[in-house]
């Protein structure tokens, strides 16, 4: 017979004081700040969202168009492939085209195998880029590796450019990996093969950074990354990398995949590391659907940072998931309409309404959580659920403001959102909703 539950013990647990510390991430890992163009990375600067084009870099107009789209979506740095002479020759024209559009987004050159040759033979390319990405696993092989690595570093020093030393387990330095595997096999207590591979990743990045410093590249010109495609391995690699250095760190899960799988994998890995204070810049490496929108990776990166409370980029739209009480699609359609409307308007709103990115909007589907959740938002609406009175109360800054009825609820609510933004964040902002005059119901 099982013992009776101790009611007094249970009550004592309930009466224990709640945590009085503020919920939030661990303190940021202290890193050396690096300037990439006019964007600060590390050293306590806001975590930067970056992206990469998938155009043929030799296609100047196509690459300009995609960089502009990524930048306008919120990418704060954009990386392009520089894989051959035609691409290197195109880089200055791409930079000029972007600047003519009024965009100052830093452009990063991604180099593999022949970066030393391209940068030396196309000095205008070396000058036009804001940062060079070097992969220590393929910068050169055998006796050429150190020389070709040094060539790129010296060009970076000459042009006062930042460098990312980016190890990737798909192109890991095989000499280093073989050396560590042999040492591990001879050990009395050999480690798991994956653990040795992770160690090779970290060593590849750190040894390359140390070599770059010996050549003369200062720490405030270097960013490190060590990307793998498995979530748990990525977390372990970056934890180790952060514990052993104070270089600025770029986070990314390589080959994350398509659609929801790629979003979930990247968010799971990067979310844990960011919560631990690790990471100065991020990229969500999504495989786009054929003909899909490349800016999706920027949006996901922003949403990850915003939902975790690190930064604000666009107003948040809270919406309930729906249940049997919400058999119509009205609230879903309104939530999508408001969210799309906000994203479409943000390029203009950023300059016109400073601070609008902090706005919270709620679109709820029934009476259960609708009014309460709407009160927590700056402006929220509680639509009627199945069998409820066909009326939608609107709450502004915690107070009931108006009840909408009829067939134009969506348009009426959107108009109220615009009115709120103009009054709260416009040229002569007002402190609260008291300035908005509610209409008679």
Curated annotation (Swiss-Prot):
The gene is ispG. [4Fe-4S] cluster binds at residues 320, 323, 366, 373. This is 4-hydroxy-3-methylbut-2-en-1-yl diphosphate synthase (flavodoxin). PANTHER family: 4-HYDROXY-3-METHYLBUT-2-EN-1-YL DIPHOSPHATE SYNTHASE, 4-HYDROXY-3-METHYLBUT-2-EN-1-YL DIPHOSPHATE SYNTHASE (FERREDOXIN), CHLOROPLASTIC. Pathway: Isoprenoid biosynthesis; isopentenyl diphosphate biosynthesis via DXP pathway; isopentenyl diphosphate from 1-deoxy-D-xylulose 5-phosphate: step 5/6. It catalyses: (2E)-4-hydroxy-3-methylbut-2-enyl diphosphate + oxidized [flavodoxin] + H2O + 2 H(+) = 2-C-methyl-D-erythritol 2,4-cyclic diphosphate + reduced [flavodoxin]. InterPro entries: Dihydropteroate_synth-like_sf, IspG_bac, IspG_bac-typ, NO2/SO3_Rdtase_4Fe4S_sf. It comes from the Bacteria. Its EC number is 1.17.7.3. Its cofactor is [4Fe-4S] cluster. Belongs to the IspG family. One of its GO terms (molecular function) is 4-hydroxy-3-methylbut-2-enyl-diphosphate synthase activity (flavodoxin). The keyword Iron-sulfur applies. Binds 1 [4Fe-4S] cluster. Converts 2C-methyl-D-erythritol 2,4-cyclodiphosphate (ME-2,4cPP) into 1-hydroxy-2-methyl-2-(E)-butenyl 4-diphosphate. Keywords: 4Fe-4S, Iron, Iron-sulfur, Isoprene biosynthesis, Metal-binding, Oxidoreductase. The keyword Oxidoreductase applies. GO terms for biological process: isopentenyl diphosphate biosynthetic process, methylerythritol 4-phosphate pathway; terpenoid biosynthetic process.
């Amino acid at each position: 017979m099982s013992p009776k539950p101790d009611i007094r013990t249970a009550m004592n647990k309930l009466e224990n004081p709640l945590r009085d510390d503020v919920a939030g991430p661990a303190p940021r890992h202290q890193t050396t700040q690096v300037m990439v163009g006019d964007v600060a990375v590390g050293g306590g600067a806001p975590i930067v969202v970056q992206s990469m084009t998938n155009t043929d870099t030799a296609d100047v107009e196509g690459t300009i168009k995609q960089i502009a789209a990524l930048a306008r979506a919120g990418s704060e740095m954009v990386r392009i492939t520089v894989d051959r002479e035609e691409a290197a020759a195109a880089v200055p024209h791409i930079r000029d085209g972007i600047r003519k559009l009024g965009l100052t987004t830093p452009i990063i050159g991604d180099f593999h195998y022949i970066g030393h040759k391209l940068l030396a033979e196309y000095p205008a390319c070396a000058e036009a880029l804001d940062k060079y990405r070097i992969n220590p696993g393929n910068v050169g092989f055998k006796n050429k590796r150190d020389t070709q690595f040094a060539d790129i570093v010296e060009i970076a020093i000459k042009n006062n450019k930042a460098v990312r030393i980016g190890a990737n387990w798909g192109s890991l330095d095989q000499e280093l990996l073989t050396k560590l595997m042999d040492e591990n096999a001879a050990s009395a207590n050999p480690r798991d093969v994956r653990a040795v591979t992770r160690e090779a990743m970290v060593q590849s990045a750190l040894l390359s950074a140390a070599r770059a410093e010996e050549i003369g590249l200062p720490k405030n010109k270097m960013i490190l990354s060590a990307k793998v495609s498995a979530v748990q391995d990525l977390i372990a690699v970056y934890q180790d990398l952060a514990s052993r250095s104070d270089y600025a760190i770029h986070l990314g899960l390589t080959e994350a995949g398509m659609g929801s799988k790629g979003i979930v994998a990247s968010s799971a890995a990067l979310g844990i590391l960011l919560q631990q204070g690790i990471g100065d810049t991020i990229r969500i490496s999504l495989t786009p659907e054929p003909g899909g929108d490349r800016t999706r990776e920027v949006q996901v990166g922003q949403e990850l940072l915003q939902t975790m409370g690190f930064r604000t980029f666009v107003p948040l739209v809270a919406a309930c998931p729906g249940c049997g009480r919400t058999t119509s699609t009205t609230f879903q359609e309104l939530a999508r309409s408001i969210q799309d409307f906000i994203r479409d308007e943000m390029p203009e709103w950023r300059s016109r309404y400073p601070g609008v990115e902090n706005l919270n909007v709620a679109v709820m589907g029934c009476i259960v959580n609708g009014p309460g959740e709407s009160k927590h938002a700056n402006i929220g609406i509680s639509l009627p659920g199945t069998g409820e009175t066909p009326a939608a109360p609107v709450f502004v800054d915690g107070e009931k403001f108006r009840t909408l009825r009829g067939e134009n609820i969506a348009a009426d609510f959107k108009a109220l959102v615009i009115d709120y933004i103009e009054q709260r964040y416009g040229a002569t902002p007002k402190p609260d909703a008291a300035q908005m005059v509610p209409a008679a119901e």
